């Protein structure tokens, strides 16, 4: 959806050069479009092929020419075609009508569900909120997921990096967060698929429908809007689709005054697309071939994701690390903006511990006594040190067995195993697979539960009672059930 001003204000230019996804357009003297304006080209080429594409102005070249980047394929585009300056940046639909729908970078629905029932649109380029409008007091965003809330709590209006390979539960974790923010916080979510596989986008959409996150029968009951610019799209679309998703999220925050979750999968592809566009525009590459404007590009997106006095956008961003090199400029620049990292470990998934969040590798700037309080901080650190000691003892156990450990170490191992099991939790969105009802665990219950394990109050309960339950009351009930079954 591109801004279409009144005919009198439209300036018409002519396409003079096409180089892949980049085109040069000549305009009348004194009537050049502004940088970031959308240009619309609708024409028939000599072969009779209908051309309809939108491009975004990136450079003013001189000689009344501008250079623009196309948001869709330029196949069939020829010199001499008319390009119209829309007089405004690309705009996308916003509001409740976007929920349950799938959009492309231009805000056009691509789910074959008909037009979007809203006239409200917003430009994808805008300034970050003013400092005076920001909520500066750090506030923990409760997710209801024990391992996250205790060991790597999210900041409301913060940015979280989600790291994990294939098949360790990223999608299910994302679905559970979307479900929990809708039920417990009355918030909505926006999912931005940036440069990932089309198949994954389709699978995600089908899984959302299956788990009830998208209500196919009544879209107004859906909890998420989706915005996709997949791997096969030109770099312009992949570079801007993150902003399209962010613009939809900003409307829910600023106009509806809601708490919003924004998912970006994958933030690395956003940087990668910017690098491609930069090269096409003829800019001199910087370190490792990235664009010289890397810091600015990432900053423009990240600084708009924040908590204001009216509402918040909490962002969870999947981060692909090229060749597992954390010093690569793309992930290194992204890390500078993150408040927390959630690392999913294959070893935990292999043990059947879900969510497979690594309790020792996941971090958060919120885990400090001045923010979460002394009790939460001490409990989290005690849990981590117990798990760390268990990790150190595993080599000895593998070689000599448990019997060779000291009494104290055996107790540590016993408690660590219970902690590891208690960090697992049944999810609402996985009910159809597990047959177990999902659990949302309040932070106070989480802290109390882990304190009881650490203090030794539950040493007599079997390890299995701690697996895939919510709070400690459920552990005790499960222990009774296991006892009666023997």
Curated annotation (Swiss-Prot):
Gene3D superfamilies: 2.40.10.170, Bovine Mitochondrial F1-atpase, Atp Synthase Beta Chain, Chain D, domain 3, P-loop containing nucleotide triphosphate hydrolases. Its main location: membrane. One of its GO terms (molecular function) is ATP hydrolysis activity. It catalyses: ATP + H2O + 4 H(+)(in) = ADP + phosphate + 5 H(+)(out). ATP binds at residues 164-171. One of its GO terms (cellular component) is proton-transporting ATP synthase complex. Transmembrane segments: none annotated. It is a peripheral membrane protein. PROSITE patterns: ATPASE_ALPHA_BETA (PS00152). Keywords: ATP synthesis, ATP-binding, CF(1), Hydrogen ion transport, Ion transport, Membrane, Nucleotide-binding, Thylakoid, Translocase, Transport. Pfam families: ATP-synt_ab (PF00006), ATP-synt_ab_N (PF02874), ATP-synt_VA_C (PF22919). Its EC number is 7.1.2.2. It is found in: Cellular thylakoid membrane. The keyword Cell wall biogenesis/degradation does not apply. NCBIfam families: atpD. Produces ATP from ADP in the presence of a proton gradient across the membrane. The catalytic sites are hosted primarily by the beta subunits. Belongs to the ATPase alpha/beta chains family. F-type ATPases have 2 components, CF(1) - the catalytic core - and CF(0) - the membrane proton channel. CF(1) has five subunits: alpha(3), beta(3), gamma(1), delta(1), epsilon(1). CF(0) has four main subunits: a(1), b(1), b'(1) and c(9-12). This is ATP synthase subunit beta. It comes from Prochlorococcus marinus (strain MIT 9312).
């Amino acid at each position: 959806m591109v801004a279409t001003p009144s005919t009198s204000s439209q300036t018409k230019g002519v396409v003079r050069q096409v180089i892949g996804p980049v085109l040069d357009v000549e305009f009348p003297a004194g009537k050049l479009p502004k940088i970031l304006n959308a240009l619309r080209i609708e024409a028939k080429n000599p072969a009779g092929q209908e051309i309809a594409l939108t491009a975004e102005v990136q450079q003013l070249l001189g000689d009344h020419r501008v250079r623009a980047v196309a948001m869709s394929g330029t196949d069939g585009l020829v010199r001499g075609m008319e390009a119209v300056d829309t007089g405004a940046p690309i705009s996308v639909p916003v509001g409740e009508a976007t929920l349950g729908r799938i959009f492309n970078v231009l805000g056009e629905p691509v789910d074959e569900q008909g037009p979007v029932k809203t006239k409200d649109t917003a430009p994808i380029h805008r300034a970050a909120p003013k400092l005076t409008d920001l909520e500066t007091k750090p506030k923990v965003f409760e997710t209801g997921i024990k391992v996250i809330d205790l060991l790597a709590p999210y900041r409301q209006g913060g940015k979280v990096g989600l790291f994990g390979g294939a098949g360790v539960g990223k999608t299910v974790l994302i679905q559970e967060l979307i479900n929990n923010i809708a039920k417990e916080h009355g918030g909505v979510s926006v999912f931005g698929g940036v440069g990932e596989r089309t198949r994954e986008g389709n699978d995600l959409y089908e899984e959302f429908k299956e788990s009830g996150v998208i209500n196919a029968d009544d879209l107004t009951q859906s909890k998420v809007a989706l915005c996709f610019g997949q791997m096969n799209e030109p770099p312009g679309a992949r570079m801007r689709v993150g902003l399209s998703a962010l613009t939809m999220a900003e409307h829910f925050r600023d106009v509806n005054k809601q708490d919003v979750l924004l998912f970006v999968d994958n933030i690395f592809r956003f940087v990668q697309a910017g690098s491609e566009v930069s090269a096409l525009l003829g800019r001199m590459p910087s370190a490792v071939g990235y664009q010289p404007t890397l810091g600015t590009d990432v900053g423009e997106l990240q600084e708009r994701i924040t908590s204001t006095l009216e509402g918040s956008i909490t962002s969870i961003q999947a981060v692909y690390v090229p060749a597992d090199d954390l010093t690569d400029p793309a992930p290194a620049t992204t890390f500078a903006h993150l408040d927390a990292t959630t690392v999913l470990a294959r070893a935990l998934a292999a043990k059947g511990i879900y969510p497979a969040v690594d309790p020792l590798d996941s971090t958060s700037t919120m885990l400090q006594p001045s923010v979460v309080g002394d009790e939460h901080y001490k409990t989290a650190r005690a849990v981590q040190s117990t798990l760390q000691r268990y990790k150190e003892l595993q080599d000895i156990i593998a070689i000599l067995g448990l019997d060779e450990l000291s009494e104290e170490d055996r107790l540590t191992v016993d408690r660590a195993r219970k902690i590891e099991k208690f960090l697992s939790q049944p999810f609402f969105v996985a009910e159809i697979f597990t047959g177990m009802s999902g659990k949302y665990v309040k932070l106070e219950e989480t802290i109390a539960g882990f304190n009881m394990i650490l203090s030794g109050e539950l040493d007599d309960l079997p390890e299995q009672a701690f697996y895939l339950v919510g709070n400690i009351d459920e552990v005790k009930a499960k222990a009774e059930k296991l006892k009666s079954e023997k």
